Amino acid sequence: MTSGSHNDPMLVTILAGLAALILVSALLWSANYVSYRWIKERTLRERPWDYNICCGETDGGGINADIVRHGEIPRFELVTDVTRLPHGDGAFAHVLCSHTLEHVDDPKAMFAELRRVGRSVTILVPPLWDLAAALNPFEHRVIFLTFATRHDDRLPPYVVFGPARWIQSVRGQRIIAHSPGARLMKALGLR
């Protein structure tokens, strides 16, 4: 037996652990890409959205609104309170709210306001199969109890994400309006 043969099982264990880490990371990134990018882009292509609330960096075709301007978005509207939008009842035929309700303290109040200004409201939320998003304690304040990303004219059930609220009370809430790769890297503290 050579002196290096004792290290072979350890090397195999290390390599297997590294391979598992790479596989899990790839699966988390893929789920996050499908949840945040692919489904959102498919939804955006369906029609021009009269009101794209909390638009981030996307153009929905109508008014694009957010609490902060993330880039050069056409027809941008700055909103200061997502529970008191500056529009009349039923002002928009089609409202899109993508990956926002999980960030707010009171999703019911925001959804009620979306229903007030929109005749048809589509929301996209992180589904439970997207673990990196659904369980993101740095950004999200609630966990939606759903395996679907898209919900038309209804708010899926959710629970308050208590540990996240504690973390955010200490570190602040981070909201990243970029690609899912950047979002995942920042959430993991790698950027």
Kindly give the residue locations of the regions a language model identified.
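Short, solvent-exposed secondary-structure boundary motifs
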Residues: 41-43, 136
